[in-house]
């Protein structure tokens, strides 16, 4: 039964049938690596046990998260539907697509947000850009546009554009937001799931982080309206406030306070009241 199903599975996972261009080879390699990573984790759990592997991943979670972001930036992996431009221009929209399909309904991302971000490279990431409209436009007010300004301290996911350029900046923008959202949610659930013995329920935190990061609502609005940034700001500020209250060293408390202020600025500068009001009320109740 497995052997009979293999051709269909192979075609769906690797899409070997249409391999005709040289571009498909690196795409297949990236696809193979994406499949290999979870298989390595499963294999390690079988060989060494689920609990030791889980504890190792918990201890090195920030290093693992940074490694995932670095790999995505190096390989130019993002969730953008910018491939739709190939479709509009009469080309194959699946070119260089590792997985999935460019979504036509995500026009806010590939027609507005991403082109605005890319255009900043041609203006030196200036505060005003005259490439749109009949007069220079205020680009800082645009959520997705990176600007060389001090206020970008509160928009850390834009730093990839300034440091790495448009293509890898886009990869950083997508991957960093997802990884940081997962880690922030994980830390939040660790914080609220402590029992009286101060035992952290890592399994509960992991499931909670998965449910938040992969929630349909989050994924639907992932590319626009800064919902991930708002959630990250809330989760990180709650965790830092909890640690601020429990730490007596002044240097640590100052660092926690600084991070909370950055989160407050990040939340305020998302500039989307429809989400800010409801999430702000939720934060007050928490």
Region spans (language model):
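Start-transfer (signal-anchor) and selected internal transmembrane alpha helices
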Residues: 27-80
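Conserved small/polar residues in nucleotide/adenosyl-binding loops
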Residues: 285-286
